Amino acid sequence: MEAMNMNIPRDAMFVPPPESEQNGYHEKSEVQQTSYMQSQVKVPHYNFPTPYFTTSFSAQELLGEGFQASISRISAVTEDMQSMEIPEFVEEARRDYAAKTRENEMLGQQYEKELERKSEAYRKHQEVEADKIRKELEKQHMRDIEFRKEIAELAIENQKRMIDLECRYAKKDMDRERTKVRMMLEQQKFHSDIQVNLDSSAAGTESGGHVVSQSEKFTERNREMKR
């Protein structure tokens, strides 16, 4: 830190000489007073200390008689800080670590229990749902069997009806054919041509004949059909 240099300004107050000086002899008296104030700002930091500044100035200069100040700068340097082993803090850290370990284990156990509880509840719920689905599938299977039986019976019944229908109309066709044959037999017509040729060395003989035979048998049914 540099000291302040005091300079007396020109407009300083004039002090009249004392009476002894007026009476013929001189007595010189001069009083000089200097005072200063100093302020320091320190910001301690464990890792990187910051620089701080000191300022000094005269109180008289603050009153208007001029201002002159010197500033000295102190640069900060990095200091190696060693950890202090305090038994109380060591014991407290040990207790905190043990408590944290216990709480961590408790959280893990709670998580496992909650996971097991939810898994068991879900498993039971799924078993109930699976049993419901199984029973419903069994019912559906029985319904499918009944449906297939009904379809098979319906198909068999339909085939029987179709067979009966075919038989009925086939019988009608047979009846018509039989009737037609009977009618053709009742109305017979016989037609024959006979021709004989005899040829020899002495003479030749030729003989021929034509025979037509027709008979009709009328019955009451034929008359109705003709009508």
Swiss-Prot record:
Keyword Coiled coil: yes
Transmembrane segments: none
Region annotated CAHS motif 1, chain positions: 122-140
Keyword Coiled coil: yes
Coiled-coil annotated spans: 90-140
Keyword annotations: Coiled coil, Cytoplasm, Repeat, Stress response
Gene: CAHS 106094
GO biological process, one term: response to desiccation
UniProt region (CAHS motif 2), positions on chain: 159-177
Main location: cytoplasm
Disordered: annotated span: 1-28, 198-227
Cellular localisation: Cytoplasm
Lineage of the species this protein comes from: Eukaryota, Metazoa, Ecdysozoa, Tardigrada, Eutardigrada
Protein name: Cytosolic-abundant heat soluble protein 106094
Entry's free-text remark on domains: CAHS proteins contain 2 repeats of 19-mer peptides designated as CAHS-motifs that comprise each two octapeptides connected by a tripeptide.
